[in-house]
Regions:
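Exposed, low-structure sequence patches enriched in small/polar residues
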Residues: 1-204
Length: 204
């Protein structure tokens, strides 16, 4: 259920789910040897599995937005707890914060200038299997934890009637902290990059 307070720009959502006979993809590591009989590595095998019991997931999400004149600060914090991290892994805590200012130039050009950050605590994030284009539970033998790394971006949006010009600087904190810049195992986040462009809405 959700409780919302418009006056304070606050919303709280709490939920509990009970999932029975949960089906999922899993990655199994199969060891293989070289011609001399020595261990050479692992090969991946993707399989479909089903958990015969029940998995419970508790979640609570708090949205809190602030506005002080031209300054805006939008926030979301989510807490999740799964009863079985081995088959349904979830980060305990995830957060998003967006701080920006909005003002006008010459009364016609609306400017939005700010930055945002995303963060989640460490967990065994699902692996990606390109051969089936699906996410899978990591193999217990070689699984790795991801998270505890903020992803920071900066941006500017310029609005003129139906036209928007934007500049995004993504992953501005590249190379800092624990450098664990992954959302999916073995697939690093792109280093700092700049995107810019123009969009037009064709309506009156």
């Amino acid at each position: 259920g959700t409780l919302s307070w418009k006056r304070t720009r606050t919303a709280l959502t709490v939920g509990v789910e009970n999932i029975k006979n949960y089906a999922y993809f899993a990655t199994d590591k199969i060891a293989y040897n070289d011609e001399g009989g020595q261990f050479a590595g692992y090969s991946n095998r993707i399989s479909v599995k089903q958990y015969g019991g029940s998995v419970q997931v508790f979640s609570a999400r708090l949205n809190q937005n602030f506005k002080f004149g031209i300054l805006h600060w939008d926030n979301e914090v989510a807490y999740q707890k799964t009863s079985n991290q081995d088959i349904l892994p979830l980060p305990d805590l995830s957060a998003y914060s967006n701080l920006y200012i909005v003002f006008r130039i010459a009364k016609v050009l609306r400017v939005q200038l700010g930055g945002d950050v995303r963060y989640f605590t460490e967990y065994y994030a699902p692996d990606y299997a390109p051969i089936i284009q699906q996410f899978t539970v990591q193999s217990p033998e070689t699984r790795m934890k991801l998270g505890n790394y903020p992803i920071c971006n900066a941006y500017v949006n310029l609005f003129l009637k139906h036209c928007r010009f934007y500049v995004n600087v993504n992953h501005v904190n590249n190379g800092t902290g624990n450098k664990n810049a992954f959302l999916v195992p073995h697939y690093p986040i792109n280093p700092m990059n700049i995107h810019f462009g123009l969009s037009w809405n064709f309506f009156n």
